[in-house]
């Protein structure tokens, strides 16, 4: 192919081979061009013109707008390779060299408008050694680096769901061998698949890459001893980032183990069913628990809240520490308001540190860092006079080294800083001895021009003579065409206009050379000083990241205190008991959607020695689903260290939450609604423990009545009597037959959603009371839904016949079908 192409297209072909499955943007002058299939992709996704040259499809984008176009492509899951042309300022002859200098993928964003402010942007790598799976996870924009190891695909998949990465890395053999796993991840996540060489996933290569990156000779200090699959995944991910994407890795934090035992586990189905991060029928998180709880003021605090929401604590100490801090700020309202004001001025310290580490920082970024650090100093000062809870003790103290940095940035930088280093005006005059001298020359040039203009007006007698500046011409003298013959011979013609002539002089040309030289010297000097400043800031990087963690923790607990104050939340007692007792509990999301005082609170009392299963009956629309979801949400909030919407609560720590609520067909897997329901229920039966909380809504409804009832009762009995599986369970059902279990098992208690009748019409009270429901009121709900009245009337007739002695109603004669 290359023999038939021009030299430039041969160069493109070489770059395309290196780019692999990336879309190649090839720099040609002031445009980035795409050719062949890439041109079609570019035109289709960016709505730009597709053209042809010598029968080669091509499309292009202006170099000045590259970042915006790249963001649009990456947001659609494309991987981009950028081929830049070498500097040809010296005017060398021949083809300008071009090489790929960066690759951009959805999971490897250092700085982009696509980065969510209050969420991480993860890329993960997975390796396999025998039956073990290694997982590594990176957020390049913050430097966060996590590793984990799993002995089954279920736990691996759930971990990936919780991390919600935008890109998955492995090698071809893994993808072939684990196709069902990969398809499942693609089905539930918007994730781009990437491949890397298989040898990078081998232990020797992986450890060497980790040693080099972190300047160590052993990984034992990171707690990775024996975790071969995790090490393989981590090393391969670093290799991919550095060697293939050509991105820096020196700013990464040391790898931390992403451990299951530290958190309350909430699987993907439960996250969705409970609408933790986004509402099932909402947009952009509206109607979710996250939307209700989001009161954070900083990007770091927002990310911490989001991560904790899907990974609540299982360690009682961690929960109590945060509860104490929330209580402290709840009582200290003036301090809380003051700190929130300061926190709102703190920018993303993690990502600013990454930008500086990777030489992507602009002067404006350094200004944001300076202002953020000043706000942190104000926070530390405001906290000094208080006796802080243990969680915050010493957290907001700023070291003397960091104080020196803050002082330097405050005194040495100008207040308003430019977006680009080339724009200058970054440092104060006193910062360097040559700055003031060069700036004075530049400033005095304006007065020199005015003086020169006035002098030659006097010498020539032309009062309307002007000295002007244009980018193409530089400085010039302009007079009306009629005055041009009066000018002395030393005036050199530069340009003729319709009614004017433009000239220069030796004196003006000499002045221009001096001014331009000064501007070049100023730009060179400030560029050099800016690089030195970034190096100085990097000496404090670890302190900045430590401060970032502190600010995130502080923002987190203050936001929970704000939430508690706004809705009068109370502190739950969380301990190692097996109690689940909630008085006057309310659904945190529904509470915000209704007028104050209109939500009906309900109690819950469960205890392994007494009631550990509630069978909940009642008609649709009476509040059953809201109630059982409410219990799960309150447990999650409590184990986040948050206060909850309840008068009081006693919650023994829960290890896992499972939900089986609603379903739809899974066409991509060839699974019916009932099959999805059974698969989710099977997962619960296999993985629930005595310390789990299980929420079941209408299990068994997707098949015949007796089949469904049999399945439902078998599930109930399994969770009641199987050792190690005796989870606290709330089971909402329409099967009245199940309520008889209360007579035979002391651990089962019937409750129902209260409905009163008024003139034969049901009135939903949204109260949960002891006992089982007597009626379902399904026909009434059908009427409310808009059923034709004739259908409603016929349904009532059939219901009366079912409830009478003859349990097999005959079809109306007019409706009987003639079968033969």
Curated annotation (Swiss-Prot):
Keywords: ATP-binding, DNA damage, DNA repair, DNA-binding, Nucleotide-binding. ATP binds at residues 618-625. One of its GO terms (cellular component) is cytosol. Pfam families: MutS_I, MutS_II, MutS_III, MutS_IV, MutS_V. Belongs to the DNA mismatch repair MutS family. Transmembrane segments: none annotated. The lineage of its organism: Bacteria, Pseudomonadati, Chlamydiota, Chlamydiia, Chlamydiales. GO terms for biological process: mismatch repair. Disulfide bonds: none annotated. It comes from the Bacteria. The keyword Heme does not apply. It comes from Chlamydia muridarum (strain MoPn / Nigg). This protein is involved in the repair of mismatches in DNA. It is possible that it carries out the mismatch recognition step. This protein has a weak ATPase activity. This is DNA mismatch repair protein MutS. One of its GO terms (molecular function) is mismatched DNA binding.
């Amino acid at each position: 192919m290359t023999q038939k192409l021009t030299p430039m297209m041969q160069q493109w072909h070489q770059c395309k081979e290196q780019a692999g499955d990336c879309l190649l943007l090839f720099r040609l002058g002031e445009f980035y061009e795409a050719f062949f299939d890439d041109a079609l992709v570019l035109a289709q996704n960016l709505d730009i013109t597709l053209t042809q040259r010598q029968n080669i499809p091509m499309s292009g984008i202006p170099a000045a707008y590259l970042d915006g176009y790249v963001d649009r492509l990456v947001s659609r899951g494309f991987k981009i390779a950028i081929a830049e042309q070498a500097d040809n300022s010296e005017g060398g002859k021949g083809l300008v060299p071009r090489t790929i200098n960066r690759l951009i993928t959805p999971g490897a964003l250092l700085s982009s408008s696509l980065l969510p402010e209050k969420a991480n942007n993860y890329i993960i790598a997975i390796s396999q050694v025998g039956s073990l799976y290694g997982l590594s996870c990176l957020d390049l924009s913050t430097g966060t680096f996590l590793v984990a190891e799993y002995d089954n695909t279920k736990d691996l998949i759930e971990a990936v769901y919780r991390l919600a990465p935008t890109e998955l890395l492995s090698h071809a053999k893994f993808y072939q061998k684990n196709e069902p796993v990969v398809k499942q991840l693609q089905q539930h996540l918007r994730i781009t698949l990437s491949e890397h060489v298989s040898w990078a996933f081998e232990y020797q290569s992986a450890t060497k890459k980790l040693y080099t990156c972190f300047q160590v000779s052993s990984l034992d200090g990171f707690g990775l001893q024996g975790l071969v699959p995790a090490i393989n995944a981590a090393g391969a991910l670093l290799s991919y980032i550095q060697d293939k994407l050509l991105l820096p890795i020196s700013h990464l934090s040391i790898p931390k183990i992403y451990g299951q035992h530290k958190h309350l586990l909430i699987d993907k189905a439960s996250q969705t069913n409970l609408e933790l991060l986004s509402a099932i029928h909402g947009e952009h998180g509206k109607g979710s628990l996250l939307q209700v709880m989001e009161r954070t003021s900083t990007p770091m605090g927002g990310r911490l809240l989001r991560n904790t929401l899907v990974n609540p604590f299982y360690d009682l100490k961690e929960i109590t520490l945060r509860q104490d801090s929330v209580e402290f700020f709840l009582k200290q309202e003036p301090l809380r308001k003051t700190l929130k004001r300061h926190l709102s001025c703190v920018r993303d310290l993690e990502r600013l540190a990454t930008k500086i580490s990777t030489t992507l920082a602009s002067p404006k970024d350094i200004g944001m860092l300076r202002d953020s650090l000043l706000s942190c100093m104000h926070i530390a000062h405001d906290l000094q006079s208080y006796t802080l809870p243990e969680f915050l003790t010493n957290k907001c103290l700023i070291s003397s080294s960091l104080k020196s940095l803050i002082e330097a940035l405050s005194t040495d930088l100008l207040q308003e800083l430019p977006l680009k280093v080339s724009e200058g005006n970054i440092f104060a005059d006193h910062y360097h001895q040559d700055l003031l001298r060069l700036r004075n020359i530049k400033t005095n040039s304006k007065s020199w021009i005015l003086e020169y203009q006035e002098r030659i007006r006097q010498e020539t007698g032309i009062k309307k003579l002007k000295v002007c500046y244009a980018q193409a011409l530089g400085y010039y003298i302009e007079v009306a065409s009629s005055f041009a013959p009066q000018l002395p011979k030393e005036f050199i013609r530069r340009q003729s206009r319709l009614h004017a002539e433009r000239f220069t002089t030796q004196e003006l040309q000499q002045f221009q050379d001096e001014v331009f030289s000064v501007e070049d010297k100023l730009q060179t000097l400030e560029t050099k000083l800016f690089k030195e400043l970034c190096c100085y800031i990097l000496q404090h990087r670890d302190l900045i990241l430590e401060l970032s963690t502190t600010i995130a923790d502080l923002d987190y607990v203050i936001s929970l205190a704000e939430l508690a104050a706004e809705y009068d939340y109370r502190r739950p007692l969380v301990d190692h008991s097996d109690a689940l007792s909630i008085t006057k509990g309310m659904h945190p999301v529904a509470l915000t959607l209704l007028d104050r005082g209109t939500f009906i609170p309900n109690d819950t009392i469960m205890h392994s020695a007494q009631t550990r299963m509630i069978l909940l009956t009642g008609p649709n629309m009476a509040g059953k689903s809201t109630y059982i979801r409410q219990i799960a949400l309150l447990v999650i909030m409590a184990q986040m260290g948050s206060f909850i919407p309840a008068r009081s609560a006693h919650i023994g720590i829960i290890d896992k939450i499972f939900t089986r609520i609603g379903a739809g067909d899974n066409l991509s897997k060839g699974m019916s609604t009932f099959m999805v329901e059974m698969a989710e229920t099977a997962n619960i039966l296999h993985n629930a423990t005595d310390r789990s909380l299980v929420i079941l809504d209408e299990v068994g409804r997707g098949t015949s009545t007796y089949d469904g009832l049999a399945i439902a009762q078998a599930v109930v009995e399994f969770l009641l009597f199987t050792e190690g599986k005796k989870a606290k369970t709330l089971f909402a059902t329409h099967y009245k037959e199940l309520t008889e279990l209360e007579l035979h098992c002391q651990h089962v208690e019937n409750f129902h959603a209260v409905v009163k009748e008024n003139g034969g019409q049901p009135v939903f009270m949204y109260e949960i009371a002891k006992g089982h429901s007597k009626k379902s009121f399904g026909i009434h709900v059908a009427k409310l839904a808009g059923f034709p009245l004739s259908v409603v009337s016929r349904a009532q007739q059939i219901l009366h016949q079912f409830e009478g002695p003859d349990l097999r109603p005959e079809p109306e004669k007019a409706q009987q079908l003639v079968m033969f």
